[in-house]
Amino acid sequence: MQITRVEATPRSGEGLRDVRGDVVRRRLQADHSIQLTEVRSIVGFLINSDITAEQISQRADDLFADPIIEHSLTNQTFLQSKEIFDQVPDAVISVGFKPGVTDNPGKAALDGFRTIFPNASIESDISTYITYAFYGVKDQATPEFIASNLYNGLIERAQISTAEMCENNEWPMIEYPARPPQEFKQPAHIDLEINDDKLIEISETGLLALNLEEMKAIQSHYRDAVVRRTRQEVGIVENQPTDVELECLAQTWSEHCKHKIFASKIHHRDLETGEESVVDSIFKTHIMKPTHDMQQEVDWLLSVFHDNSGVIAWDDEWSVCMKAETHNSPSALDPYGGAMTGIVGVNRDILGTGLGARPIANTDVFCFGPPDWQGDIPENLFHPSRVLRGVHSGVRVGGNESGIPTINGAIIFDERYLGKPLVYCGTVGLMPRKLPDGRESHIKTPTAGDIVYMVGGRVGYDGIHGATFSSLELTEESPSSAVQIGDPITQKKMIDMLLEARDAGLILSLIHI
């Protein structure tokens, strides 16, 4: 196995332009009044494979570049080419993903690579990076400031060449992000016979987002004599949960999964009349109960509140399902990745409804701080205009690459969304009322002894603690691991495969986990 570097950059000439570079140039001008004469871009591919550099070079234009509008180069960088880059830039910045973080462009390139080289090692892998060359910077901004607007340090790494380094031909060279070897560790047993301060410490250090009352409820559960006896009978440590058990409880009780605020008792006082009342769960009182009451009167509410999405009968042949959810905290840390994960996640909720529905349309509502905000921004959080662009792009790309159009939406601006945006992602799905074998498509039929498969894209190091993180306030120490990056292209393949399996009668039950 060896690393081969392939780069592609737009050609210059009449009618040709560097779109990526122009987008960055206009963004810096709009957000920071930085007037640049030009920004040029290079897309890089780092190929870890047993295929030789010579073989790759011969096919570079078939996969990594469009020879009509782009140049390609193997095991060199275009910045060293005086023919292509005939002027010395004022700054150069290269951006790539950190080791283990999901790299969707790399995955797509790898699919094509394996098509062209079917005998390549199964261990072959491709990572990507983008290099930007800036002209006309002068004293308007430092390279470090420009870089801070190009990459997200939670999931990406950047290398910078200053004007002096550029004059000396010292160019940034992003290297292949080798993943550290994975080591299996036995689950740790957690002693809960501790004081309240230590219970809170376990919750905080483990990003469990559980308050003292919840931690004490868990402590009480593992003190229960029946629980201890049952655990002892099956060979489990009777009085100490594993860290995995605590993670499962914390995820189940998270705001993302449990919606504790909507489920709690709300003490309400009417400011005009002074009348006081208690609402026992906004969700159960004002959403579930009216829906169940309606279900008694109509025959078209087929499935509500117990599956991945609700199902209604559209006509005698088709059912429609719809689901919407928020993805606020991840979108604050990484607007593009957080929003993309939100939309492809709710796509999977539709797919996981009943025996499988096809997602056919997306919708969204975004709430951000004012895009022209001139005040302070908390450290490690982004300006509202950057959040707006990233979220919009993430939802757009997530839908388009899955083959699901976004048909409508709304955007609201308010100062109260400076600290955390509100990102609603919704999907509409379609399913036949009955499958070819006569089963009703909205009814799952699992039985004991069924074979269970888990399908999807490869899991990266991103997205850990994403559910529990939804219950925490955003701070300067918010964890990078909580940001997950979706993979819409792989998901599109999965959707088509599962719906084909559904129609063949192979699926008894499925769920989005």
Model-based region annotation:
Residues 511-513:
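Conserved small/polar residues in nucleotide/adenosyl-binding loops
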Residues 1-505:
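Core nucleic-acid recognition elements
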